[in-house]
A protein has these predicted regions:
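Short, basic and Ser/Thr-rich N-terminal targeting/leader segments
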Residues: 58, 65-67, 150, 221-222, ...
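Conserved active-site and cofactor/substrate-binding residues in soluble primary-metabolism enzymes
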Residues: 4, 25, 43-46, 105, ...
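Anion-binding (especially nucleotide phosphate/pyrophosphate-binding) glycine-rich loop
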Residues: 2-132
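Structural signature of FAD isoalloxazine-binding scaffolds in flavoprotein oxidoreductases
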Residues: 33-34, 40-45, 72-90, 137-168, ...
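Phosphate/pyrophosphate- and phosphate-bearing ligand-binding catalytic cores of soluble enzymes
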Residues: 19-20, 71, 157-276, 283-284, ...
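Short Pro/Gly-enriched beta-strand edge/turn motifs at strand-loop
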Residues: 135-138, 173
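Alpha-helical scaffold segments in soluble metabolic enzymes
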Residues: 8, 50, 109-113, 153, ...
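Short, solvent-exposed amphipathic alpha-helical segments in soluble enzyme
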Residues: 55-57, 245, 280
Length: 303
């Protein structure tokens, strides 16, 4: 262990929230991934800022995660610092028609809070398995809704260590992208502008979406969510199915039989199994339909 670097980290964040050689399989929804050299869980935006400053000063690589959805960490793990903005930074509060959330708040929890306040517009996100930090960065969406429809502002940490607020017109939100992703900003919090609605109708709609997910998505197995981005004019799952890959397996990883757009950890898969399966899917889909599938899942660590 790099003791001097550990000492620097623990000068800005409590020791009980600094972990050494932490298995990433505990922190990703795929349930795979080797150890991160350091794993920290800040509980305030100032702690995030200070940890990043220390990493930069030491030339230490770092990576920000939320609840570990949409992420594939290699079996070798990560040589650097994983900064998890999740349970220690997940406060949500309602102010009129605004819902303000820290970056680690789960989308499902924010949707529940909005429902409790009879605010409509965020139902689409109630089943997306991620935090609002990641959702802002990639303009997450489902069932016809996207973050860009409801985001009022986002508080970020810039590359120069400044904490600033970006208004909706500054966010440059597109399909699975934003100015946050383009500039490498770190999301610290967000404000959503919603509309007054009927609590019963909001709940009914959320229940309908939940039923769709349970019926159509392989929620009973670990996965990272949708594995590939939607190619323009196509659906990734349909292209994968048309290539004859429903149920296709490499080691413990499998193309879900329930929904071909999902790669699942069927049986003690390794990250290498999942990566090879994704590679094979890309090759077969390209051969069958001529379409290049681009991963939606982020890869991290040495292969």
């Amino acid at each position: 262990m790099n003791q001097s670097f550990y000492d620097k980290l623990t000068s800005v964040i409590a020791k009980e929230r600094v972990y050494v050689d932490e298995p990433m399989s505990r922190h990703t929804t795929f349930r795979v991934g080797g150890p991160a050299d350091f794993f920290v869980t800040p509980k305030a935006k100032e702690e995030v800022r200070d940890v990043i400053r220390i990493c930069k000063e030491a030339g230490m690589p770092y990576y920000i995660i939320g609840n570990g959805s949409n992420l594939l960490v290699s079996d070798a793990g990560y040589r650097g610092v994983i900064v998890q903005i999740y349970k220690e930074m997940n406060e949500v509060k309602v102010e009129g028609d605004l819902v303000k959330a820290q970056a680690g708040a789960l989308l499902s929890g924010i949707a529940a809070k909005a429902l409790g306040a009879e605010l409509s517009g965020f139902e689409f996100a109630s089943g997306i398995p991620g935090t609002i930090g990641g959702a802002c960065m990639m303009n997450a969406g489902a069932y016809g809704g996207e973050m860009k429809d409801v985001l009022e502002s986002v508080t970020v940490l810039t590359g120069k260590g400044k904490i600033i607020e970006l208004g909706r017109n500054e966010l440059e939100l597109g399909y699975r992208t934003s100015v946050i992703a383009k500039k490498g900003y770190i999301v610290l919090g967000a404000a959503l502008k919603l509309e007054r609605g009927d609590g019963e109708k909001i709940k009914t709609y959320m229940d309908e979406l939940k039923e769709k997910r349970v019926t159509k998505q392989p929620l009973e197995y670990p996965s990272a969510g949708s594995t590939f981005k939607r190619p323009e004019g196509y659906f990734a799952g349909k292209l994968i199915e048309d290539a004859g890959l429903r149920g296709f397996q490499v080691g413990g990883a499998q193309v879900s039989e329930k929904h071909c757009g999902f790669v699942i950890n069927r049986d003690h898969a390794t990250a290498a199994d999942i990566m090879e399966l994704m590679r094979q899917v890309q090759i077969r889909v390209k051969e069958n339909s001529g379409v290049d599938l681009e991963p939606e899942v982020k890869r991290l660590g040495d292969e």
